[in-house]
Amino acid sequence: MSVTDCFTQINSFTQINHFTETHRYVGRFAPSPSGDLHFGSLIAALGSYLQARSQQGRWLVRIEDIDPPREIPGAASRILAQLEHYGLYWDGDVVYQSQHHARYREILQQLQQQGMSYYCTCTRSRIQQLGGRYDGYCRTRNLSADNAAQRLRQTTPVFHFHDKLRGNLYADKTLAQEDFIIHRRDGLFAYNLAVVIDDNDQGITEIVRGADLIEPTVRQISLYQQLDYAIPTYVHLPLVLNTEGNKLSKQNHAPALPDSDPRPVLLAALQFLNQPLPENGQEMTLSALLAWSVAHWSLNIVPLQAAINTSTFTSAFSKGPW
């Protein structure tokens, strides 16, 4: 099911329990070490960086290394080196999710003790036969943790949320009401659990990321509510597509960002985000180019539609999905 199958825009919605204006802005970039950063990764990193710096906020980096089978040795250090090469320097220490297992287990135990989660032995094939959405079969079976996943008992489904770029988005009801997995059967911590705990613990006030993560947002907000955490605001940036119209990704073998002069690539990224460009951008120092971009950053003019990127980093745009 695509993102556009699960979400539509609506005209009115007021989100409760957000951080207030008195909180200092804290943003983040949270890549997984499954490969080097590519142009699509740069769009998310640059967009979140400019949004944070334009509000005199902090910009944190977190390595989401909770899925070892998908990780590539050395990718985390290369990602950090790439960010530095492109002038995107972060605040504070880099956080690694692999160091937070005890914290995740603490919250899992809390949810279980409070009756807010339960164990489930349903297989992926069974759920696929149901159309891809879990039906709550194990909700009242009182199963043990043996060879079982742990699911959130959904009590606060979120049917819509506000995106600062896209407006108000409405989720498919079956997605919003699903008891989703927070601890996998194979013992790994689910992405939705880890990201909510870490964003809360790091004091993240706004999440700026790619539009491919619109769908999990309602699940994450529901978990925020059940844990009584303050909910950050959200911005979902347009995706970069390859020439075949697919999302530029590590899984689709997107080429790594070049390690040559970063300025032409940054200018292409700014152009992709529909931002104004300095007349002498190629001649500016990297730090001056980024400072100029921070001063002229405007979220309101970022496009909604995905776009095709070419290998020469020109702006070949075409309409596409989020």
Swiss-Prot record:
Signal sequence, start to end: none
Keyword Transferase in record: no
Amino-acid positions noted as binding Zn(2+) in the UniProt annotation, renumbered to this chain: C120, C122, Y134, C138
MF annotations from Gene Ontology: ATP binding; glutamate-tRNA ligase activity; zinc ion binding
EC number: 6.1.1.-
Cofactor, free-text remark: Binds 1 zinc ion per subunit.
Disulfide bridge partners, by residue number: none
Keyword set includes ATP-binding: yes
EC main group: ligase
Keyword set, alphabetical order: Aminoacyl-tRNA synthetase, ATP-binding, Ligase, Metal-binding, Nucleotide-binding, Zinc
Record-level GO BP terms: glutamyl-tRNA aminoacylation; tRNA modification
Co-factor requirement: Zn(2+)
A GO CC annotation given for this chain: cytosol
Motif residue range(s): 'HIGH' region: 31-41
Role this protein plays: Catalyzes the tRNA-independent activation of glutamate in presence of ATP and the subsequent transfer of glutamate onto a tRNA(Asp). Glutamate is transferred on the 2-amino-5-(4,5-dihydroxy-2-cyclopenten-1-yl) moiety of the queuosine in the wobble position of the QUC anticodon.
Family statement drawn from the similarity comment of this UniProt entry: Belongs to the class-I aminoacyl-tRNA synthetase family. GluQ subfamily.
Stated name of the protein: Glutamyl-Q tRNA(Asp) synthetase
Gene: gluQ
